[in-house]
Amino acid sequence: MYQEQRMSAIVEYLHTHRTITLDEICDMFTVSKDTARRDLVKLEENGEVMRVKGGATLSSSHIIDYSERTPTKAKEQIAKEAASLMSEGYDVLLDTSSTIALMAEYMDVKHVTVITNSIDNVDLLDQYTACDTFLLPGKFNGKNRNVTGPRTISTLQEYKVDQLFLGTCGVGADGITSPSEEEAFLKRQMIQCARQVIMLADHTKFEREFLHRVCDMSDIDILITNKEPEADVKEKIEQNQVRLIVTDFDKGEETQ
């Protein structure tokens, strides 16, 4: 198979599986690691993938729009667990995330004050009359159905909330990352105004690294996911005393 054919197949694979390793490329095409690495280098030069440790992921320009992402059983389990952590009378901040948007389905009609930059969160929470919801000001982003920008940042600086429910694109041993500089900056400000940071991340977000750093693992208080992270990430979680909740219904595990 020619290099161009392999490269096309790799990109097609990534649209379904999100990440690919050098070993997987070697097995798929019966090539050496050097050949697999050259394919990824070429794809990165073309702007189609982003190389990460031991493989590659889709570049930010190829990441599926927020509006096109569909709920999965894993995300529903994570959202249900996250909603159970809300308490009566809390002031909470909700990030823009397809998983966080699902939390509205599992809220037990608690009287909480919600601040968010997500249009979908506002729409979904409208069903709860006991919930006071505030949409942050800013520039509308049609791709992610949220508001961002300097006005959003400056308004966040006026708040101190009990809980932040944070979404993410990449989780690794070195911390949390995002493909968007603007998104990373916004998330950092959200973290600064929260007493407790709860991150929601399904297993596809692990071992993915992007250009812009959001925060260190030490900035997270609770991490909710659906599968046990790899050893290096779990070690970092334990070192920083992050409460890890694994919602895999086959295991029902929780690590503190």
Residue ranges and their predicted role:
Residues 65-66, 93, 100, 178, ...:
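Amphipathic, positively biased hydrophobic alpha-helical segments used for protein targeting
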